[in-house]
Amino acid sequence: MKLQDKIAIVTGAASGMGKAIAEGYATEGAKVVVSDMNLEGAKAVAEAIVAEGGTAFAIDTNVTKAEDLERLFDETVKTYGKLDILVNNAGIMDGMEPVNEISDDRWDMIFAVNTTAVMKSMRIATKLFLEQGHGVIVNNISAGGLHGGRAGAAYTASKHAVVGLTKNTAFMFADKNIRCNGIAPGAVLTNITSSMTSVSEVGVARQGLGMALNPRVGQAEEIAKLAIFLGSEDASFINGQVVTADGGWTTY
């Protein structure tokens, strides 16, 4: 097993890619903390993992609340004694708005979830990792963090920021046995579109030009396999990279 007895937090793990990552990590032997705002969904994932012989517990976490993040890490260490891997997966979509249509409230919320919460989680995790002498961070970002036409301006900017945060963190702690990498999924079958409201007709029309080039929609389990690799010792020499998984969509 690639992650035997590793302790892993996965945020946004009640559904979609987070669920697949949590389940995949458990299958590879990790003890998983299933974190999500949707506690019932998180419990269902944790219970399914335990039913299959794995180890997991669920915790309700609003990643925009500092006290929830502190509790998440405190409960993890209290329960398992340490943290080996942090998977920042929680995220929300914008409404495809170009910059002239963005409201301050939308911008602030997108950044609170997609960027600031990631930074705060990494800040707590790196303190633990420095004390332990090791640790791994896997940020599930987006092809929108590498390109300009995969979402609206707010989502795109929020994900570009996480790319920079990922690379800077990898550099800063490369001599401390701490790795930080990212995943840039293309179109994947998840429920993230449920977070979209007041969708921009202009933005959808422009973004749709690129969708015509997409060879296929990916499955959450395909992203989970990459997250397993990056979290494992198989990726011990990989640091500061953002790996695209999109079936060749962005090669054009």
Positions of the model-derived regions?
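Short C-terminal tail/terminal secondary-structure segment
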Residues: 93-96, 147, 228, 239-252
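Canonical Rossmann dinucleotide-binding motif of NAD(H)/NADP(H)-dependent dehydrogenases/reductases
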Residues: 3-33
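Substrate-binding pocket helix/loop in short-chain dehydrogenase/reductase
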Residues: 97-99, 103-108, 208
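Active-site helix of classical SDR
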Residues: 122, 158, 166
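C-terminal helical subdomain
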Residues: 182, 201-234, 238, 245-247
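Residue(s) in the substrate-gating loop at a strand-loop-helix junction
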Residues: 142
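Short, small/polar-rich loop/turn modules that mediate ligand/substrate recognition or access, typified
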Residues: 174, 179, 238-240
